[in-house]
């Protein structure tokens, strides 16, 4: 369990919000005060609210569901890419395509096209096409990778969405809300927190702040997935045990005694046989 500490938040500059003239009044309850024209985030609330977000992400992945990382602005791209890959989950780091979630069946067709182009490039069969066609397909593959490369293995909708800057990722937030997918987001002083299920008040512009939160959420996803695997393995072991006993474990052993010789022509001989009685 890797909850964030006050010291980590301070060192990453999480407490620095936007200028006082650029704020959303709905964030007032998460603001400690202002200094030199900059709002200061109440980090005591951040610590508590991040703990709730962390536990939620852990619970989601412990159920075998995925988390979609979203951060398309320049400061967030590297952290989103690296931490999502570390957690072996999905991400959008360049541009959110409208309908990426709400029109997922169509997006699946685009993913299939991307997989086809990647396959023929990797196995060399692209060389069977005319040069003009090869150039065209190579450009198409690069373009698709930039848009959907991070979700190319996603077969179902995610169990949660982790967003850096919900104001910048407003389309992703709207699609998630429309589909009832819970949203966890780093919310700065200029954002509207109303559409966010798990608000993490803090700086969503500083690279260090973004990386801190992305890495911690990745830790939560990894922890939850590990729990999921442990439950799966425990279930498999139980099934194997039951199969070994024909679906039920033995609960008693009956003793059957048989007199082989009554002693008239020598010592008394008694045979003892144990019979297993399976559970009903």
UniProtKB/Swiss-Prot annotation:
It comes from the Bacteria. GO terms for cellular component: cytosolic small ribosomal subunit. Pfam families: Ribosomal_S2. GO terms for biological process: translation. Keywords: Ribonucleoprotein, Ribosomal protein. This is Small ribosomal subunit protein uS2. The gene is rpsB. The keyword Ribosomal protein applies. It comes from Desulforapulum autotrophicum (strain ATCC 43914 / DSM 3382 / VKM B-1955 / HRM2). InterPro entries: Ribosomal_uS2 (IPR001865), Ribosomal_uS2_bac/mit/plastid (IPR005706), Ribosomal_uS2_CS (IPR018130), Ribosomal_uS2_flav_dom_sf (IPR023591). SUPFAM superfamilies: Ribosomal protein S2 (SSF52313). One of its GO terms (molecular function) is structural constituent of ribosome. Belongs to the universal ribosomal protein uS2 family.
